[in-house]
Design a protein with these regions (language model features):
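Non-catalytic structural scaffold of enzyme domains
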Residues: 1-271
Length: 271
């Protein structure tokens, strides 16, 4: 039994979709969340900058005495060196491994689509893991750099004409290719899931990286003996790197409920 909190971070607020799922499967666990809202998005930046930001995010969470760290960010998960993750003093997981496995389990025609930030797609991390498990798979990857800004700025309401147009622009090629499974390779993308599903069609299975990762993290915490033993009453503390004004309203969108915890701005560059 371990009463320390779970640490979760993302480039912005998208990682709250993973927190939402984590609270569903582990309602008694305490959570510390950091959203780097002052430097979002990470996906358009170079590898060295992404790794630098990830190191700062991780150092901050370690100072909060967390017992387990979840990089609820496809860009970091695809870029942060695994050898560094292995040297951290607490277990670390990203979103790529569990999500890739879920896609392999779901596909019927062995045609898998991957959408994510430019950095995530460029890394080839999803494709490499999927091909290890399913060598004869056909993979169709597409960077969707506008999706994170659209979500962070509230353009995710069902039927928004601007968002629908951009979804069609990005995903038509994958639809034409006949993918039957599509990885939502960024934790912001579940906010667009309804519109993406409407465009791709009911026959295409959408793999939510935040949901899959939360389930995998819960299993890992249990296996490692790190759960706190509580069934209810988990608390949450939220930290951001930009002004926290209207955080509760924005967080409600990602969590499906009001945050119900404290939110504090920090100077992440000092970590």
């Amino acid at each position: 039994m371990d009463t320390r909190p779970i640490g979760v971070f993302d480039s912005g607020l998208g990682g709250l979709t993973a927190v939402r799922q984590l609270r569903r499967v582990l309602p008694g666990e305490d959570i510390v969340y950091f959203g780097d809202t002052g430097r979002v998005p990470y996906g358009s930046r170079g590898r060295d900058i992404i790794v630098q930001y990830a190191r700062q995010d991780i150092r901050f969470l370690l100072q909060q005495d967390v017992k387990f760290i979840i990089a609820a960010c496809g860009t970091v998960s695809s870029t942060y060196p695994p050898e560094e993750a292995a040297r951290l003093p607490v277990p670390f997981t990203g979103v790529v491994g569990a999500t890739a496995r879920a896609a392999v389990d779901a596909t019927r025609n062995r045609k898998i689509g991957i959408i994510g930030t430019a950095a995530t797609v460029r890394s080839g991390s999803y494709a490499a893991i999927i091909r290890d498990m399913m060598p004869d798979v056909q993979i169709f990857a597409r960077a969707c750099p506008m999706f994170v800004p659209l979500v962070e700025n509230g353009y995710f309401n069902d039927g928004n004409p601007v968002t629908k147009l951009i979804i069609a622009e990005y995903l038509q090629e994958l639809k034409d290719a006949g993918v039957d499974t599509l990885i939502l390779g960024c934790t912001h993308y579940p906010l667009l899931k309804k519109m993406i599903g409407d465009f791709m069609g009911d026959e295409v299975h959408l793999v939510d990286s935040g949901k899959v990762t939360a389930q995998a993290a819960a299993a890992a915490l249990d296996e490692l003996g790190l759960l706190n033993g509580k069934k209810t009453g988990g608390t949450a503390r939220y930290f951001v790197s930009d002004t926290p004004d209207n955080f509760d309203e924005l967080a409600h969108t990602f969590l499906g409920e009001y945050a119900g915890g404290t939110v504090e701005r920090i100077a992440i560059e000092t970590y």
